[in-house]
Amino acid sequence: SAVRSNTVVSRSKLRTLYSLARRIESAGIEGIVAECGVFRGGSAALLAAATSPARQVYLFDSFQGLPEPGEKDGQQARSLYREGWCQGTAGDVRAVCRRLGVADSRVHLVEGWFQDTLPAFPPHPVALLHIDADWYESVRLCLSTFYQRVSPGGCIVFDDYGRWEGCTRAVDEFLSARGLRDRLVDGHYVVKPAERDVREDLPQCD
């Protein structure tokens, strides 16, 4: 499919992304969809197609591949890393979004390294945040930038939790500091607490 050929996100995680996208619509959660780490746009297109045509989608990527991992990312990441790894293009993203019938006007590409683009991003409320950023510093910056903007009942999804040491460490530290570590579902996503218990009827990863 157009989605699978333009992403390295697993099938089970794509199904969960779709379910969460539908959930923010049915629950009327306010805000944009934001994805940090876009590659060729497969998961971004899925999120855009699964949400309302009125909901704006912001996609953050350098389109130069992953940055070099740091000390907190562990030996495996540093030994496997190659320059240009996971590099897509803005054209790839536009093409797959169009194939899924998503209007260009909904999709906003924010090109550049996170440390350059995220601090300057306007404080839009966020309904769903998908972090596919692999390394400790990148994931930590995404969380510190966007967490306060996520609406109550909104979803934060971590693609690389449990796969890469740096991502796992960044997520554990961030959530634990806020008493949210036990709300991490299947090591994959967390729903920002609201007044009611937002853990009811949440989709499970296979």
Predicted ranges, named:
Residues 13-16:
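N-terminal pre-P-loop "Q-motif" helix
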